[in-house]
Amino acid sequence: MNPTRLANAKRLVVKVGSALVTNNGTGLDLSAINDWARQIAVLRQQDKEVVLVSSGAIACGMQRLGWAKRPKSVHELQAAAAVGQMGLVQVYEGAFAKHGLHTAQILLTHDDLADRKRYLNARSTLNTLLELGVVPIINENDTVVTDEIKFGDNDTLGALVANLIEADALIILTDQQGLYTADPRKDPSATLINEATAGDETLEGMAGGAGTRIGTGGMITKVIAAKRAARSGAHTAIASGRETDPIIRLANGEPVGTLLVSQTQPLAARKQWLADHLQLAGRLILDAGAVNALHAGKSLLPIGVIAAEGEFERGAAVACISPDGREIARGLSNYGSGEARLIARKTTQEIENTLGYVDEPEIIHRDNLILS
């Protein structure tokens, strides 16, 4: 395991599974939760930013309601999630408060990250919380979703959050030592894989598909999550949450568990996402000065926009059109079409006078823009 890969990570997402959070379904494991908070506090002292993705609401609710068997009814699962989330948040808040850290609860659905406007709002909120030194604690909003309450949700959610905040690393803590060449519970010759490339097709065959009766995912979902996180440049570590100080040791670059390495630089991965996965909702007509600015790698400011065509909301993908009608770039607009028309040809300082507020100083930030 290359020690520099995670040691250089400044922004990390840590995902802990239900089996760890609830001590295999016997109630919240207070000792483990307090220990994770202690480890994350150490990382905060090292000026590392950490987002915690925690499973456990449904499992905690099952324990509180006295249910030994995971129900199959969606509404019963949602009821358990509602009951359990209360206990989960209270415990995390108390654990981090011992180290002088504030926490924030964020409940997401996959739809929140698929919708561009909500995606930008979630990203802005998370970035603000991290700037404030707060530890965001994220869980799937199981009480309102339907299809998302299924196999592997929070492994996927951890990867999506890593993409969302452009994290350097995703740490997935589980009840296994890492990824093996075969299921070690069935094959005594199975060996631990120390390092591999995220997205290697052979890994999914090694991972199998078994989960626990408390959680919903198995190792296969973690391998798929690592592949997804790698698209935005994040390396993924899969390790046992029952090791001594796994979060600290991984963040320091120690060889714990399995490291699945992203072969893509973060910015390149983000640009690829912008190029391949966005449907254009409108067009911004630019002046020559704005065209030159974009070619120089700068953001698109309102003063360089002549007109906005089409009807689109904040976060929508738009094409940037040169004065001679050529598409020169595309990106995510920080303003809806109505707002864009109002602030076109205005300086950044004039945005607030025009709209009464400022979402962002740019119409399209350079990180959300790719040249055509």
UniProtKB/Swiss-Prot annotation:
Residues that, per the record, bind substrate: 55, 142, 154
Superkingdom classification of source: Bacteria
GO CC, alphabetical: cytosol
Keywords from the named record: Amino-acid biosynthesis, ATP-binding, Cytoplasm, Kinase, Nucleotide-binding, Proline biosynthesis, Transferase
Binding site for ATP: 15, 174-175, 216-222
InterPro entries xrefs: AceGlu_kinase-like_sf, Asp/Glu/Uridylate_kinase, G5K_ProB, Glu/AcGlu_kinase, Glu_5kinase, Glu_5kinase/COase_Synthase, Glutamate_5-kinase_CS, PUA
Protein's pathway: Amino-acid biosynthesis; L-proline biosynthesis; L-glutamate 5-semialdehyde from L-glutamate: step 1/2
SMART domains tied to this protein: PUA
Enzyme class label: transferase
Reaction catalysis annotation: L-glutamate + ATP = L-glutamyl 5-phosphate + ADP
Stored PANTHER family: GLUTAMATE 5-KINASE (PTHR43654), ISOPENTENYL PHOSPHATE KINASE (PTHR43654:SF1)
Family to which the UniProt record says this protein belongs: Belongs to the glutamate 5-kinase family.
Protein name from the UniProt record: Glutamate 5-kinase
